[in-house]
């Protein structure tokens, strides 16, 4: 909130692994009310966490920049399914429930 009050940022970068989904949505609402642009980023997340971020971005539609890199070591990925990535786009399956991930 201090960032918004002091006007010291043009963008806020939201990362679900640092805030969680509900807090990310709160941050987005505060930023939008102050006309601060939003971007979403990630760290080394599983398909499940990445799927949550992709769904949030698609559902909210308020992000100017999206930096959601796929898992860099697919052999260590604990989940199957989730959003399909074909640079620079993610595709969500209309046929799978929820995030669309299952445990390997």
Task: Outline where the language-model segments fall.
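Catalytic core of soluble alpha/beta enzymes
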Residues: 1-49, 76-85
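Flexible C-terminal active-site loop/helix
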Residues: 6, 43-104
């Amino acid at each position: 909130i201090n960032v918004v009050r002091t006007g010291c940022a043009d963008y806020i970068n939201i990362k679900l692994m640092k805030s969680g989904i509900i807090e990310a949505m709160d941050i987005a609402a505060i930023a939008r009310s102050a006309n601060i642009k939003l971007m979403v980023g990630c760290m080394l997340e599983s398909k499940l966490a990445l799927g949550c971020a992709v769904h949030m971005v698609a559902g909210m539609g308020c992000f100017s920049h999206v930096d959601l890199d796929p898992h860099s070591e697919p052999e260590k990925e604990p989940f199957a399914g989730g959003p399909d990535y074909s640079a620079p786009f993610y595709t969500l399956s209309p046929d799978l429930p929820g995030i669309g991930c299952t445990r390997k």
